[in-house]
Amino acid sequence: MRYDPGLIEEKWQKFWKNEQVFKAEEDETKTKYYVLDMFPYPSGAGLHVGHLIGYTATDIVARCKRAQGFSVLHPMGWDSFGLPAEQYAIRTGTHPRETTEKNIANFKKQLTAMGFSYDESREFATSDPEYYKWTQKLFLILYEKGLAYMADMAVNYCPELGTVLSNEEIENGFSVDGGYPVERRMLRQWVLRITAFADQLLEGLDELDWPESVKQLQKNWIGKSSGASVNFATEHGAIEVFTTRPDTLIGVSFLALAPEHPLVDLLTSDEQKAVVAQYIKETQSKSERDRISEMKTKSGVFTGSYAKHPVTHELIPIWIADYVLMGFGSGAVMGVPAHDERDLLFAEQFNLPVVSVLNEEGVCINSCCEGFHLDGLSGEEAKQYVINFLEENHLGAAKIAYKLRDWLFSRQRYWGEPIPIIHFEDGSCRPLRDDELPLLPPEIQDYRPEGVGQGPLAKVREWVQVFDTETQRAGKRETHTMPQWAGSCWYYLRFCDAHNSAAPWAKEKEQYWMPVDLYIGGAEHAVLHLLYARFWHQVFYEAGIVSTPEPFKKLVNQGLVLATSYRIPGKGYIYPETAKEENGKWVAPSGEELDVRQEKMSKSKLNGVDPQILIDEFGADAVRMYAMFSGPLDKNKLWSNQGVAGCRRFLNRFYEMVSSDRVKEDNNFEGLSLAHKLVQRVTDAIEKLSLNTIPSSFMEFINDFVKLAVYPKSAVEMAVRALAPIAPHISEELWVLLGNSPGVQKSGWPSVLPEYLEEQTVTIVVQVNGKLRARLDIMKDASKEEVLALARESASKYLEGCEVKKAIFVPARLVNFVV
């Protein structure tokens, strides 16, 4: 019989849908397992090969766990708010909702074609009013706890996009989306007080089964540092400086302030005002990431003022430097060029003194003056001495600082959750009541922003202006919207109870499903989505509305998918199919030599692969199998369409084997042993997420199994059940072909019996006068006489014409003939 995925895959996809095979149930008699993908933004580009790696991995685990008797929750939804749909609306006039719905429909079609086993009954999009009603409600919980507030903030503002951007949305002073110039501005913004949970966020990492690299990234992002605050007196008040190295205080040769520091105007002398103003203007075009990037030179400008050193009382020049950020410490640093590489670059750039106060062993030197004696001290002893001195003289104190800053939450966009707040003229505001949610945005035609710092909602006067019946006052709705991160902060909780109209989730359902047992997604979310979701979850935990302190028990980051790219140097990329190899070199159709590399798949590099084309040619099961076979889940991997073809050939062989007339009711030990060993290897691989080893295990199995004269039916059925998580369509077809009722998952996961895992043969060595002459595979229970006879036969040419004086027999190890 012939294997034709085009005939069987759609059939089984309809069966799963009609039978609701993947519908999750809160069954208290079963152990739960919650396996989740980082849900996608439904872009117009649709599903790409990078999605396939993570989605196939979670699907394999979900299918295996269901077969093993777990109650499995494996859902999918859509992170559907965001800037791309809004920018498309500005260009075309198409409502973002229309674009989003179209893209979601395309994504769903592609996911279905891959045979992923999602519980479709729990599907939602973050842009559904039924969903963001609860996003708004959860925001108000943060607001009521004092964790959401408004403040004037220095932000990255893109005039062309008309909105605030995060550091991650900027590259080299330009927006990632569109490549428009970005500048720094002070704007009134909504902010979430994530810093209030800095310690909990740090401590919680210790309990998580996450990649160490991700945990370290979050630790660095939070950036907890112990040190001291030091006050440097000036004519206009003290400058507070935070330092982690108070032991180097005597080595200070300059102070550097952030351009946004509140004392800059007061400290700038008349002679320096023009150059300082120009420097600050230039700084406004840089993102914070650009400002702190490693560079061989540092920029800065002198204020014309000096501060008094708290110990030596010497005058220290005060500079402005863009590498100093207001968000960390106090927005001022003490420059110690001899013991800080960044300070040294700055000092060399502007010819400032370099004073060494530590020797090579880290012991203080040149650090004594009246009433202050550091020489000879080192490490914590020196730091504590300085802190004690500062505190006793009211010049500073011990302090803990964090790099983490409160989360800028406002966006000047239309396509986002409206913030459910009414403002009044006296500066007060009122959060909307539950019965006023969801707050829907108005239908508009013009999606362009309204002036600096105002989103398109500000233009809809009839929506903005309201008479508040609760306070009997005229008010204005908030016109900022939430960032795309808001909806993804809690979506995993909504999946527990996706269509509850009375609450974001029912307590008993959250208690049953949480935490997420396995969460798979890209490492690029390490310090944004993952940190923000943990923050919201810990707020909810303190509020008593979730039962676990952390949302995601185990995290796995899938590696990048690479593909070969072909580029004409100085001109650009060409399509791979147009490149050809001549005389050991790759050339373009024009004859120009190509730069050939393995790079991340992307549209810009023309090396992307459309999964649907692969499905149409090879079938979804072959694509799924190769997605795992291509390399370890967490490592980068090079994609090869030839590899997909190879997996298709394997599935052809497997289909032929199962449909062969050699499949019979038989208890052949060797066949059963091969099947039990296969199941054991597959089970272990899924448990360890070593999914790339599974195709190899099947290939080894089939190579040995087809050598049998008879294929034991029970062994074949075990192999089909073990293949089902990886290649579900062909497994369903073969399961029925073997005479079983539809639904291979219902048959359970095959049990492995120890007696079939034990090797039934041993290899012994055959020697003549101590020299190796042969190796012999024998049954473990063979008698001494049988072994000696077989050994004599295998070494017969070395024994010919010789008298065997003695045969030394060591069971299961060797036979040595002495002649």
UniProtKB/Swiss-Prot annotation:
Record bears the keyword Coiled coil: no
Keyword set, alphabetical order: Aminoacyl-tRNA synthetase, ATP-binding, Cytoplasm, Ligase, Nucleotide-binding, Protein biosynthesis
EC number of this enzyme: 6.1.1.4
Transmembrane segments: none
Coiled-coil residue spans: none
Main location: cytoplasm
Localization of this protein: Cytoplasm
UniProt xrefs under Gene3D superfamilies: HUPs, Isoleucyl-tRNA Synthetase, Domain 1
Cystine pairings recorded for this chain: none
Motif segment ('HIGH' region): 40-51
GO biological process: leucyl-tRNA aminoacylation
Residues the record lists as binding ATP: K603
Superkingdom: Bacteria
Entry protein name: Leucine--tRNA ligase
Annotated PANTHER family: LEUCINE--TRNA LIGASE, MITOCHONDRIAL, LEUCYL-TRNA SYNTHETASE
Motif extent ('KMSKS' region): 600-604
Catalytic activity annotation: tRNA(Leu) + L-leucine + ATP = L-leucyl-tRNA(Leu) + AMP + diphosphate
GO MF terms, alphabetically ordered: aminoacyl-tRNA deacylase activity; ATP binding; leucine-tRNA ligase activity
Keyword Cytoplasm attributed: yes
CDD domains: Anticodon_Ia_Leu_BEm (cd07958), LeuRS_core (cd00812)
Entry GO terms, CC: cytosol
SUPFAM superfamilies listed in its UniProt record: Anticodon-binding domain of a subclass of class I aminoacyl-tRNA synthetases, Nucleotidylyl transferase, ValRS/IleRS/LeuRS editing domain
Sequence similarity: Belongs to the class-I aminoacyl-tRNA synthetase family.
